[in-house]
Amino acid sequence: MSCSCTKRTLQLFIRNVAQVELAASSTSTYPPQRTNFQRFNVPSLPSLHPSHSRAYWSAYSSEPRRDTVEDAPIENQEGPPSATEGHINTTPEKIDDMDDLFMEITPESLDALAAETSSGLANSQSRESKELKQPWQAEKSRKFIDPEETTEETWTQGEPIDIFSKPMKKPRWDKPVESLRFRSIKIDNAVAVPYSPQASTSKRNMVRDDWTPPDRKTWMEQKAALKEKFPEGWKPMKKLSPEAQAGIRALHAQYPEQYSTPALADRFQVSPEAIRRILRTKWVPKPEEEADRERRWFQRGKSVWGRYAELGVKPPKRWREEGIGRGKPEWKKRAAPVLTTSRPGTSEPRRPETISLDDQMEDRIF
C-alpha cells in the first residue's frame, strides 16, 4: 500500500496551487492491489476556471490510462462473499465508468498546472495595470457595454465569503461631504457667538402677544387675597386654647340643640366658620405634639396678657402668679429662711432690752 502521508501532502499542494478540491482517490503511480472491497462513489468536481481546467484535462488526457492485469480477472477471482457484495451489483461497464472518475497525478500534469496558473496571474496583473493607466477608457468601455450583447460572462474567483462573520460597520470617516460642511458651519457659529445666560433667559421669558393666561381657580384667588391682606400670615388676636376646643366639641356632642353653632360662636366670641371647623376636625395630636403645643400656647398667653397688662387690664390669677401685671403682693411672698447655730430646744428665750414697770415691781417683791 502507498504511504498516506505522501498522499496527504500531494493533495494539499494541488489544492493550494490549482485551487481544486480533489476527491479521496489513489494518487500513486503504482497500480494498487485489487481486492474485493466496496468502491465508493466520488463526488463531482466543482467548476474550474477555464484556463485551469483546460490545462488539467489536457494533461490528464495525454496520459494513457493504465489497465492493469488485475482489472480483467476481477470477475474470475473467487473469494468468500461479503455483505457489501450482496447489496451492490458491479458490472465491467460500471467499473470502467467509475475508473474514469479517478485521476492520476504525474509530475508533467503538475508542471502544466503551475505554468497555466502563473500565466493567468500575469494576464490579470497586466489587465489591471492597463486599467489603472487609462481609467477614462475603462469607464467608456463600461458605459457602452450592452448586457444583452454579451453572451459569455467571464468568471473570476474572488475571496471566499465568510457567512459566520459579522457585518462590518461603516467607518466614521466615510461620511457625506454635505453633513461635514453643515457640521463645520454649526461649530463655527457656536465658537463665534459666546454663550450668554441673559440671552437664554430672555428667550425663555419671551411671551407671545396673543397669549392669555388660563383662568384661575377659586381657591387660588382666595389665597392671593389673604396674602395681600395679611402679608405676615394669619395672626389673630383671639385664639381658642386646646382646652376650649375640646370643651366646644364635648358640649356640642352632649347638647347639640342647646349648644348649636351660632350659640357657641356667640358664647366664645368667634365666627361661626371657626366653630364649624373645630367641630369638623378629627385630628388628635401625639404625645410629643401635645407637649410642644402646650409649650407654645403658654408662651402665647404670656405675650398676650403682657400686652393687656400694659393697657391697664388686670390679667387672670394664673398669669398674675407668673409675674404678669402687678405681680404678687408683699405679704404673699415667702420670707427668706433664718440660719441659726444653736440646737433646737436648747436656746433660752431672749429677754427684751427694755424693762417694763411690772418687771421692776417683781424684782422688788419678795
From Swiss-Prot:
Q: Pfam families, per this entry?
A: Neugrin
What InterPro entries has UniProt attached to this entry? NGRN/Rrg9
Stretches of Polar residues bias are at 116-126
State the UniProt keywords alphabetically: Mitochondrion, Transit peptide
Q: Which domain of life is it from?
A: Eukaryota
Which residue windows does the record flag with biased composition (Basic and acidic residues)?
127-139, 318-333
Annotated spans, Disordered: 72-91, 115-139, 316-366
Q: Where is the transit peptide?
A: 1-40
Q: Which GO terms describe its cellular component?
A: mitochondrion; nucleus
Subcellular location as annotated: Mitochondrion
Regarding protein family, the annotation reads: Belongs to the RRG9 family.
Q: What does this protein do?
A: Required for respiratory activity and maintenance and expression of the mitochondrial genome.
| Protein name in UniProt | Required for respiratory growth protein 9, mitochondrial
